[in-house]
Amino acid sequence: MGSRHQVVQQQNRGDVVPGAIKQKSMAVEKKNRRALGDIGNVVTVRGVEGKALPQVSRPITRGFCAQLIANAEAAAAENNKNSLAVNAKGADGALPIKRAVARVPVQKKTVKSKPQEIIEISPDTEKKKAPVLEKEITGEKSLKKKAPTLTSTLTARSKAASVVRTKPKEQIVDIDAADVNNDLAVVEYVEDMYKFYKSAENDSRPHDYMDSQPEINEKMRAILIDWLVQVHYKFELSPETLYLTINIVDRYLASKTTSRRELQLLGMSSMLIASKYEEIWAPEVNDLVCISDGSYSNEQVLRMEKKILGALEWYLTVPTPYVFLVRFIKASLPDSDVEKNMVYFLAELGMMNYATIIMYCPSMIAAAAVYAARCTLNKMPIWNETLRMHTGFSEVQLMDCAKLLIDFHGGSTDQKLQGIYRKYSRLEKGAVALLPQPLLA
């Protein structure tokens, strides 16, 4: 068997006939078929003019094995380079051969996540479509990120709630916290009591009765109330007695026709009833007769007292404006007695005027007196959430009644009825009647 060196020399000299070499090589290949070592589409290396080189058998040494491996790798690399070049150029308008590209299994697994590695048919659009695919993938990812989830929604709501908690509304003061240990304050059900008072205040509220009284007008009533205020102050009676006296007078006039001559008698008997109901030591009948300069006898006073109780059906437990004044003044958190005296001053001016008790309910008169007093004393804020909760009225609802009370304050110095004005001009009342009235828009 000839060596490889001899075979190469014969090819170079050209002594061997090509046909004979071909037949000989085919015969050798039939006898010496080798198992397929590579199932890839690797073309067998051919000799000159596309002729296969004859098989040379020699003992395989380490150096020869390394040379064969190096030659095989070099041939495979050259074939891959040629096939890629053919695909890139697209020779003769033919489609590129996809089988020339050796696909790595890893690339098949990552085709979905990296679409930019896919080889397009047209080489010109390969670089243009890859960024588009990348943008589409990133767009899908961004859409997935923007999709709201339950966790993100709850987180956003919690953040919004925390922002709201950082800016809370005006805090409502617990005005009964200091009276928890006071049994007379009945903190446990004081709110229920005032809810009942507000629901029942219209039942004891007098209607417009002046048209049914032929001998009495609004001015006469104002004179009577002004005189009762002076008598009340002279006897040093409680405020509850004064407000209940006025309520009894109006309710009786709303139910019975009364002559001008009996009007003062009605006031005296009403104060006697209210004193017995509210005071520990009520004034005697002789005291009332004496203060009226003996205009009426004891029998007349007692007889009128009986008539009044019959007309009112002995219904004396009524929510007067004073009942609400106590609660609303407490809700205003006054820092001195000046604010309290101003509230009482404006409330009594309102009770003296007939239009006030007809147009507005007792709770609104009390709330408007508190509002007008805070305006007069420049208390800021004039109306807060604590007052709104306990009174049940907003600032807008109280504006008309408060303006009316402030007008009465401004005109109290000009009119002849000076009983209330003199009472609250004293130093013991803080001289609140001397303060200038505010201007409400």
From Swiss-Prot:
Keywords: Cell cycle, Cell division, Cyclin, Mitosis
Pfam families recorded: Cyclin_C (PF02984), Cyclin_N (PF00134)
One GO process term, biological-process aspect: cell division
Molecular function GO terms recorded: cyclin-dependent protein serine/threonine kinase regulator activity
Chain's role: Essential for the control of the cell cycle at the G2/M (mitosis) transition. G2/M cyclins accumulate steadily during G2 and are abruptly destroyed at mitosis.
Similarity comment: Belongs to the cyclin family. Cyclin AB subfamily.
Subunit structure: Interacts with the CDC2 and CDK2 protein kinases to form a serine/threonine kinase holoenzyme complex. The cyclin subunit imparts substrate specificity to the complex.
Protein name stated in the entry: G2/mitotic-specific cyclin-2
Upper taxonomic lineage: Eukaryota, Viridiplantae, Streptophyta, Embryophyta, Tracheophyta
